[in-house]
């Protein structure tokens, strides 16, 4: 295609064109070379005419404006009632808002009342349901105990408890309990069906949580240490004076504030309750209104599904909903892009505003201290009250003027209203007047707009006579030889131009086809070049990314190496510091232990010396006592020897008497000495002991203070050393970390700047390239679009012409068909209507005849049934059914009562014979144990199985019995009953009979070995007689 050539053969009759152009040139040469037109300069006349027009227009505007202003001024008093009405409208908004607020308050009262009712219902329901749930739980516990019990006595006791618990419940409570048990059973079945997957889920979740918790152990330890630190900080904080002041403030003010806010809450609650009561009627009405509205909503919503219009609406929304969302998305994106485009301008504006506000701040800060600003403030203080006073007086004047103008305004308003009413009625009765006014206004405006143009044209060109002359000259030239030749030349020129246009169009079409072909080749080449460029850019971006990643990796490796070395050095330093602190702590502990040992040894030595001295003193006292006792004994022996002979002579009685007297006399005689000596000895001993104890305590206190001082000094020294070392480590670590951080920041910033530079370069290149491509394609597209548009317009024009022809043809044909069909349809409709009316009349007459005959028959039947019913009721009136039923029941009761003794004796004989027979046949030694552990248990199990197995049969029998007991009685409409025999009499008679019919239940107890082994209940007489009837 690149070597193809475009060849076009153009056939043009140039000679004919040249011949025609020569004729035109000859005509031109025969025309005069110069044409002189006399033009008068009429600028002064134009200016005068314009000034005159301006004066007239201004005068008219002034006069009309003055008239309108006068009319408005005369109607100004009408503004007073209008303003009053406006005030009334605004004031009416208040009651409207009050009504709305009252309705809202009433609705709130209704909601609150409903809420209180719901709470009360919930409380009562919780109480009632709680009793049932508690009974269910107790039954479950007793059932569990029964399942675990192995002893028959214990099982019987549990069964008795279950029976008592069930008997303590009411009818509805038992029903609710049964329903609850059924629900629990159903829930257990559901739980069992989904137990395995739930447990697997639970196991998986626990394992997951376990792994997560194990991974979070460092966090937990850190949190624990942090909590400990916070606790210590909190402890120190609560020791601060401000916290003590706060606690004192709470101790003083909290009780009063609590009481005050409690009273406030109580008052608010009482207010709300009073408001609820006050708004109760309104709330009731609001509730009923809302209930009716919601019922209407339900009906409306129920009919929406079958509504064709609603389905059309849904279809419309489904069709146009995405369009709306797309519109919103486009608007959002467009606004975001627009704001993004305005972002630089907004930044500049905000920068300018920052500078402006900063200058304003500086000016305001300097203005408040300036003399001029203070003078301005003083001026405002002086003249401000005067201004406000003047405004108040002006307002009062305007108010008084409005009050004075109110009567006049009312009359003027009536006049304006009458005029407006007249104009409205006139324009309504005669619309031509309104049309005439509209046309007059439009013509006036057009005349006002065209008058300056007309006057200007007339003034400049001397009126319209010159235009008439020019038109006459053109007409004469058209009929002259020169005009005819010129017209022929113009016609030939049109023909030549048309021929050349067709040739140019054919050439353009051929060129356009060639251009499209070339554009296709160019597009193929362009796509190839774009693919090559994209591959190149891809390689360039990949290489840049690889270089960036390599640089980041190198920087990260370097940083990691530095950080690793720093962490290793820091770790080693911390280990060494820990060892040093450990050694210092061990040395301090050893020093403290040695000091304690020395103090303990010194204390032990002092205590040992004191104990030795105390033992020696005690030993001396004992020796002194022993010696004193020996002297006393010797003196007593001498005295005894001296008085022995005299005592022997006295006899036993004298001996005893003399000994007692001597002893008493000796004690009395030496009492003061004994007391004084004893006190002296004890005082010396106690003083010595006290002095020794004080010396020991003083020595121990000195030793303890020295020990405490030594330990404190050692601890302070160790603390100071550790703090200094830690601060050094922290400072070095901070400097190293800041260096690493600064280095990494500089490396990262360099990488970011390099990436930004590369990105900006790529962006600039691609932006220029894309703009070039966009411009090229835009030019090509515009050319293609123009050509296609022209072709399309031609096709549309032809299509419109064809469509209009078809539309007119089918319209006329359809109108003819419609007219024909309408004529036929009207004839058919008339005939069918006549036939239908005749049929309807015949059917109506037939139905009325049938209705009258059936009504007569039914009336006769009804009268017959009434007579039969009255006869029956009159028969039963003469019979006392109550006494007859009472006598029958009483006879049955007497018969059963007379036979009761034989029944009990028979049962007694049976009960006496049963134990002996059972013991003899079965060899039973303890019937109670056998009946309790084996027979009773198996009888109960058999009864349970039998009742459960025959439950369906019993249900069907009961249903059949109920169905047969209630026969279907046909309904007789309009059945009249004799009013003299009331239903209350029949009900009273039946109730009286049934009261005598009921009998108490009879308990039958079966005993074996003087123990109760069974119990039966004899049902009322009806069942008893039924059983007798069955035996027969």
UniProtKB/Swiss-Prot annotation:
It comes from the Viruses. GO terms for cellular component: virion component. Residues 131-178 form a coiled coil. GO terms for biological process: viral tail assembly. Its main location: virion. It is found in: Virion. Keywords: Coiled coil, Viral release from host cell, Viral tail assembly, Virion. PANTHER family: FELS-2 PROPHAGE PROTEIN. Serves as a base for tail tube protein polymerization and acts as a template for tail length determination. This is Tail tape measure protein gp18. It comes from Bacillus phage SPP1.
């Amino acid at each position: 295609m690149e070597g193809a050539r475009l060849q076009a053969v153009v056939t043009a009759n140039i000679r004919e064109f040249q011949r025609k152009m020569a004729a035109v040139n000859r005509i031109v040469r025969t025309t005069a070379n110069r044409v002189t037109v006399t033009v008068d300069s009429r600028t002064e006349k134009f200016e005068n005419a314009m000034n005159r027009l301006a004066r007239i227009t201004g005068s008219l505007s002034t006069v009309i404006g003055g008239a309108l202003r006068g009319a408005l001024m005369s109607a100004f008093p009408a503004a007073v009632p209008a303003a009053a009405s406006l005030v009334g409208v605004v004031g009416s908004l208040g009651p409207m808002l009050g009504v709305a607020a009252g309705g809202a308050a009433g609705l709130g009262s209704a909601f609150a009342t409903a809420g209180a009712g719901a709470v009360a219902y919930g409380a009562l329901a919780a109480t009632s349901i709680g009793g049932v749930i508690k009974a269910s739980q107790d039954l479950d516990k007793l059932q569990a105990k029964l399942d675990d019990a192995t002893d028959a006595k214990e099982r019987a006791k549990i069964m008795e408890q279950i029976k008592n618990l069930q008997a303590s419940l009411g009818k509805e409570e038992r029903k609710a309990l049964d329903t609850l048990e059924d629900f629990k059973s159903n829930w257990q079945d559901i739980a069992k069906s989904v137990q395995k997957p739930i447990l697997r889920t639970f196991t998986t979740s626990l394992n997951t949580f376990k792994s997560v918790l194990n991974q979070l152990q460092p966090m937990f330890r850190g949190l624990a240490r942090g909590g400990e630190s916070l606790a210590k900080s909190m402890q120190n904080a609560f020791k601060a004076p401000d916290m003590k002041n706060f606690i004192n403030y709470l101790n003083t003010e909290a009780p009063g504030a609590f009481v005050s806010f409690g009273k406030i809450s109580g008052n608010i609650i009482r207010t709300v309750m009073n408001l609820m009561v006050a708004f109760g009627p309104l709330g009731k009405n609001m509730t009923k209104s809302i209930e009716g509205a919601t019922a209407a909503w339900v009906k409306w919503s129920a009919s929406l599904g079958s509504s064709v219009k609603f389905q059309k609406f849904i279809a419309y929304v489904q069709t146009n909903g995405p369009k709306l969302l797309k519109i919103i998305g486009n608007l959002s994106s467009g606004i975001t892009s627009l704001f993004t485009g305005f972002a630089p301008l907004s930044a500049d504006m905000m920068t300018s505003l920052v500078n402006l506000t900063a200058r304003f701040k500086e000016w305001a800060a300097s203005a408040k201290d300036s003399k001029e600003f203070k003078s301005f403030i003083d001026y405002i203080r002086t003249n401000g009250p005067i201004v406000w006073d003047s405004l108040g007086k002006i307002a009062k004047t305007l108010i008084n003027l409005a009050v004075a103008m109110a009567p006049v305004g009312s009359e003027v308003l009536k006049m304006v209203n009458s005029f407006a009413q007249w104009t409205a009625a006139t324009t309504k009765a005669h619309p031509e007047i309104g049309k005439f006014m509209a046309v007059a206004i439009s013509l006036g405006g057009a005349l006002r707009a065209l008058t300056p143009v007309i006057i200007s044209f007339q003034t400049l060109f001397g009126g319209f006579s010159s235009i008439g002359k020019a038109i006459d000259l053109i007409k004469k030239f058209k009929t002259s030889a020169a005009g005819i030749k010129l017209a022929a030349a113009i016609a030939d020129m049109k023909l030549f131009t048309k021929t050349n246009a067709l040739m140019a169009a054919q050439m353009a079409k051929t060129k356009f086809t060639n251009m499209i072909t070339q554009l296709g080749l160019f597009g193929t080449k362009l796509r190839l070049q774009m693919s090559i460029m994209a591959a190149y850019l891809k390689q360039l971006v990949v290489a840049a990314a690889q270089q960036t990643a390599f640089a980041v990796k190198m920087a990260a490796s370097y940083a990691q190496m530095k950080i690793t070395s720093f962490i290793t050095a820091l770790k080693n330093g911390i280990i060494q510091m820990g060892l040093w602190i450990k050694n210092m702590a061990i040395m301090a502990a050893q020093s403290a232990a040695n000091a304690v040992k020395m103090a303990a040894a010194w204390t032990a030595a002092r205590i040992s010396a004191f104990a030795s001295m105390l033992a020696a003193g005690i030993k001396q006292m004992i020796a002194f006592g022993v010696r004193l006792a020996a002297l006393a004994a010797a003196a007593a022996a001498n005295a005894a020897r001296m008085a022995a002979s005299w005592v022997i002579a006295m006899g036993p009685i004298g001996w005893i008497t003399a000994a007692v007297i001597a002893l008493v006399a000796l004690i009395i005689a030496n009492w003061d000495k004994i007391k004084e000596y004893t006190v002296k000895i004890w005082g010396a001993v106690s003083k010595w002991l006290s002095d020794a104890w004080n010396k020991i305590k003083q020595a121990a206190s000195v030793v303890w203070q020295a020990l405490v001082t030594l330990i404190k000094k050692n601890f302070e020294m160790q603390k100071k050393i550790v703090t200094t070392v830690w601060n050094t480590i922290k400072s070095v670590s901070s400097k190293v970390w800041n260096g690493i951080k600064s280095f990494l920041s500089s490396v990262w910033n360099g990488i970011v700047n390099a990436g930004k530079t590369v990105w900006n370069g790529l962006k600039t290149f691609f932006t220029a390239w894309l703009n070039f491509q966009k411009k090229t394609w835009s030019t090509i597209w515009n050319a293609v679009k123009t050509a296609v548009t022209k072709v399309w317009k031609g096709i549309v024009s032809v299509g419109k012409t064809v469509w209009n022809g078809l539309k007119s043809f089918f319209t006329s044909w359809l109108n003819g068909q419609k007219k024909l069909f309408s004529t036929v349809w009207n004839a058919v409709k008339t005939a069918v209507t006549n036939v239908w009316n005749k049929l309807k009349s015949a059917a109506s007459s037939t139905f009325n005849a049938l209705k009258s005959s059936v009504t007569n028959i039914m009336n006769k039947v009804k009268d017959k049934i009434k007579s039969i019913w009255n006869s029956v009721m009159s028969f039963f009136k003469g019979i006392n059914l109550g006494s007859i039923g009472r006598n029958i029941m009483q006879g049955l009761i007497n018969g059963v009562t007379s036979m009761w003794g034989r029944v009990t004796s028979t049962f007694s004989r049976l009960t006496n014979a049963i134990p002996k027979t059972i013991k003899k046949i079965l060899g039973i030694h303890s019937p109670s144990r056998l009946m309790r552990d084996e027979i009773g248990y198996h009888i109960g199990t058999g009864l349970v199985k039998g009742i459960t197995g025959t439950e369906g049969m019993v249900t069907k029998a009961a249903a059949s019995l109920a169905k047969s007991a209630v026969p279907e009685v046909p309904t007789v409409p309009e059945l009249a009953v004799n009013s003299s025999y009331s239903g209350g009499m029949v009900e009273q008679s039946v109730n009286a009979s049934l009261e005598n019919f009921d009998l108490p239940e009879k308990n039958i107890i079966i005993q074996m070995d003087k123990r109760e082994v069974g119990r039966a209940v004899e049902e009322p007489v009806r069942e008893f007689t039924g059983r007798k009837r069955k035996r027969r």
